[in-house]
Amino acid sequence: MLKIVLAPDPVLRIVCDPLAQVDSHHQKLIKEMFETMYEANGVGLAAPQVGINKRIFIIDTGAREEIKNPIAMINPIITNIKKTTSIYEEGCLSFPSHYAELERPDEITVEYVDENNKKQKLVTKDFTSRVIQHELDHINGILFIDHLSRLKRDVIIRKMKKYKKEINKSDEK
């Protein structure tokens, strides 16, 4: 299983490189990313969150939305954004136990390549749209806390630094 990179970490700030072609190595990575995401009880995971500088993310919103199957998105691009927005609470596997309310567009159209090198187009809304936007932010070096006020962002970063110190101490034992 892959290790999830915890914030703050500079690897989470890198704008990821596109993939020219999905090969068996990338398909194995995608499979391992799904295993890691499920183990952490997540609904999305981006390659930089496991230390990989590639424009790949996975989502599985399950029965919560119109998309019933897990999806891997490679080199995704949002091609249309509806003007209506909603505010919902978001979390992130790189920020365990930290949540914040964010405003995001309700509906998007995203084009991407799947794990079989097939071009895909998806129109999605609500929760799935939000998850895709969150993961797309990750591969662009943007974190969900970047959408918050400076004060809220600084509080979460301080708590994460403390959390990482505690984890490192327990790992040393």
Show where each model-derived region lies.
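Positively charged
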Residues: M1-K173
